[in-house]
UniProtKB/Swiss-Prot annotation:
This is Large ribosomal subunit protein bL32. Transmembrane segments: none annotated. Keywords: Ribonucleoprotein, Ribosomal protein. The keyword Ribonucleoprotein applies. GO terms for cellular component: large ribosomal subunit. Disulfide bonds: none annotated. It comes from the Bacteria. One of its GO terms (biological process) is translation. Belongs to the bacterial ribosomal protein bL32 family. Residues 25-49 are annotated as: Disordered. The keyword Ribonucleoprotein applies. GO terms for molecular function: structural constituent of ribosome. Pfam families: Ribosomal_L32p.
Length: 49
């Protein structure tokens, strides 16, 4: 069974976790010029993009 030989410091574990982040969805410009979230239906035109 694998057991760590030394304690991992807070800064080292935080450096490893820097890539665990949430990316926000960027709005997409629709044909009528409004911005909306991707994979959603535009209520005015009814377009799904």
């Amino acid at each position: 069974m694998a057991v760590p030989k030394r304690r991992v410091s807070h800064s080292r574990s935080a450096k490893r976790r820097t890539h665990y982040k949430i990316t926000l969805a960027k709005p997409v410009k629709d044909k009528d010029g409004t911005y909306k979230l991707p994979h959603h239906i535009n209520p005015t035109t009814g377009e799904y993009k």
